[in-house]
Amino acid sequence: MASEKKQSNPMREIKVQKLVLNISVGESGDRLTRASKVLEQLSGQSPVFSKARYTVRSFGIRRNEKIACYVTVRGEKAMQLLESGLKVKEYELLRRNFSETGCFGFGIQEHIDLGIKYDPSTGIYGMDFYVVLERAGYRVARRRRCKSRVGIQHRVTKEDAMKWFQVKYEGVILNKAQANTS
């Protein structure tokens, strides 16, 4: 009995809640619509536009002007997109890419690295990947009736997220100093 491997608690397993792909163009117009087409082609969903919060004259941005687009992907499609994004980054992330709440994010320079064929009329766009991790039971904080808080022991921490990334994707986590030398 003692020699048997202890079963892990299925409630403690970490999973991807959602993946958010964001392209921030910084201006409205034709470049933004082409960026939204890239996201739609990549995810199969129609993207949502983000508006500027306030006017910045030096950037030429007015308040409530559409300046970025993003799409939220869940389930198996999110896992596939995350895998392709991490492949571009060669499964290497910085320690500062992970937040205290167990989320992490990274960016890529060119969307054509994900396997999309280059189209001269569209151009090349970089994008950000944001991954939100959770454990089973996080619904208690989101549900409408009898809303409650997730306990401190059950929350995903920065260390939990980094360990999950290293185990699941055999990823490498670099410090800032290591990233500059390579």
Swiss-Prot record:
A cellular component annotation (GO) from this entry: ribonucleoprotein complex
Keyword Cytoplasm in record: yes
Pfam entry (one): Ribosomal_L5
Cysteine-cysteine disulfides: none
Primary location group: nucleus
Superkingdom of source: Eukaryota
Keyword terms, alphabetized: Cytoplasm, Nucleus, Ribonucleoprotein, Ribosomal protein, RNA-binding, rRNA-binding
InterPro entries: Ribosomal_uL5, Ribosomal_uL5_C, Ribosomal_uL5_CS, Ribosomal_uL5_dom_sf, Ribosomal_uL5_N
GO biological process: translation
Keyword Cytoplasm: yes
Intracellular or extracellular location(s): Nucleus; Cytoplasm
Function per UniProt: Component of the ribosome, a large ribonucleoprotein complex responsible for the synthesis of proteins in the cell. The small ribosomal subunit (SSU) binds messenger RNAs (mRNAs) and translates the encoded message by selecting cognate aminoacyl-transfer RNA (tRNA) molecules. The large subunit (LSU) contains the ribosomal catalytic site termed the peptidyl transferase center (PTC), which catalyzes the formation of peptide bonds, thereby polymerizing the amino acids delivered by tRNAs into a polypeptide chain.
Family listed: Belongs to the universal ribosomal protein uL5 family.
Subunit structure: Component of the large ribosomal subunit.
Name the UniProt record assigns to this protein: Large ribosomal subunit protein uL5
UniProt source species: Oryza sativa subsp. indica (Rice)
